[in-house]
From Swiss-Prot:
GO terms for biological process: rRNA 5'-end processing. One of its GO terms (cellular component) is cytosol. Pfam families: RuvX (PF03652). It is found in: Cytoplasm. The keyword Transcription does not apply. This is Putative pre-16S rRNA nuclease. Keywords: Cytoplasm, Hydrolase, Nuclease, Ribosome biogenesis. It comes from Shewanella denitrificans (strain OS217 / ATCC BAA-1090 / DSM 15013). InterPro entries: RNaseH-like_sf, YqgF, YqgF/RNaseH-like_dom, YqgF/RNaseH-like_dom_sf. Signal peptide: none annotated. Its EC number is 3.1.-.-. PANTHER family: POLYNUCLEOTIDYL TRANSFERASE, RIBONUCLEASE H-LIKE SUPERFAMILY PROTEIN. Gene3D superfamilies: YqgF/RNase H-like domain (3.30.420.140).
Amino acid sequence: MTMNQTVLGFDYGTKSIGVAVGQSITASASPLLALKAQDGIPNWDEIEKLIKEWQPDLVVVGLPLNMDGTEQDITQRAKKFANRISGRFGVKVLTQDERLTTADAKARLFELGGYKALTKGQVDAVSAVLIIESYFENQYD
């Protein structure tokens, strides 16, 4: 891993795609927003704006798997989303196991603000943070 990388993380979903940005130098990430998706199809112009704004060295897309590691129906769609980002924008894209990120994101948000903090967009954006953080953890294992 180079000295400092900017990493954009996506928590792919069919209705909403959480987005976060991270820095490898601090191995931390911050939630940005949740993009609306229609049946898994994002507004590619919005993604292009994010790529241009943050100029990531790497994009990490969460890979939804069952607890036993097998693929779900949405796993292939997340892989396709990752491939499209790579193809459209020419950035390096990796996938990261995202098992438990939604539960962890809800727990983290609940600690900060109770039930009112648990809006779908916030959960998705914090899930994207956790995807980036787990990517960083795996780099140093």
